[in-house]
Amino acid sequence: MISAKMVKDLREKTGAGMMDCKKALTECDGDLEKAVEVLREKGLAAAAKKSGRVAAEGIVSTYISEDMKNGSIIEFNCETDFVSVNELFVELANNLSKQAAFSNVSTAEELLEEKYIADESKLVKDVITELIAKLGENMNLRRIAKLSVDKGVITSYIHGGGRIGVIVKLACEKEDAKLAEIAKDVAMQVAATNPLFLNRDGVDTDTLEKEKEIYRVQALNEGKPEKVVEKMVMGRINKYYKENCLVEQLWVKNGDYTITKYLQEQSKEIGADITVEAFVRYEKGEGIEKKEEDFAEEVQRQMNQGK
């Protein structure tokens, strides 16, 4: 009989997952030391220890269905740029983005509990654990997002070998081959300019009031009279919209056009209105605090681990 205390002791000794510890103990008839060896042989003990390390490298991967009606984007992290270009790591990332596109789940946590698309005998989380053990680095499926459309297209753009990824939803009542090209232009715009919002309606009240207060204080600090401060604030808010709302931004390919004007021109050519309904932009490692270590200290640490 495998007790909870036995599982707890093995988990504390190896850092492996609870179910992995229970399986190992069952396999070894409750022998703690043999169970430790089993976990080490499977690479699970080492993988669990690595899971405490910061994974801020990696890639952003996207998947678009053949009919361009469904798309997904994921961020899959590892510790070094060396592993981020490893064939096994990239293959897993691409499979995960494909799985996300056709799955009913909406979060990375839910996707981890699903059967793996390329081998349904395993869960996604277990496949990742196996690769951690094989490549010797912590990995983390950080986030996923999906878009779908009935009339229009979904497309993606990857920049810098997976450093930045974007998926865009373009709506149009008329099916036209040129829609894919237009959507790609918009996706490239999102990658280049990193807009915070789709349009003015997407700017929440708290953000808007915060920006207004900042501009108001700036204007007063410049010694402007109270009566002109409000006009200055509104002028700066309009500038904020133009910089941070996708449809109001100047098009990076032609600064004479805003994205709205570009879409209007393309709508005339196609003979139907084209609108951007949504976008998702991921940049690998954004928001992750990565510990900076002295190179000599890092080498010494690795040498000590090898003793």
Swiss-Prot record:
Pfam families: EF_TS
Domain of life: Bacteria
GO MF annotations, alphabetized: translation elongation factor activity
Localization terms from the record: Cytoplasm
Region (Involved in Mg(2+) ion dislocation from EF-Tu) residue spans: 80-83
A cellular-component GO term for this protein: cytoplasm
Coiled coil location: none
Keyword Aminoacyl-tRNA synthetase tagged: no
Keyword Nucleotidyltransferase: no
InterPro entries for this protein: EF-Ts_dimer_sf (IPR036402), Transl_elong_EFTs/EF1B (IPR001816), Transl_elong_EFTs/EF1B_dimer (IPR014039), Transl_elong_Ts_CS (IPR018101), UBA-like_sf (IPR009060)
Subcellular location, principal: cytoplasm
Keywords assigned: Cytoplasm, Elongation factor, Protein biosynthesis
UniProt record similarity statement: Belongs to the EF-Ts family.
Function according to Swiss-Prot or TrEMBL: Associates with the EF-Tu.GDP complex and induces the exchange of GDP to GTP. It remains bound to the aminoacyl-tRNA.EF-Tu.GTP complex up to the GTP hydrolysis stage on the ribosome.
Protein name: Elongation factor Ts
Source organism: Clostridium botulinum (strain 657 / Type Ba4)
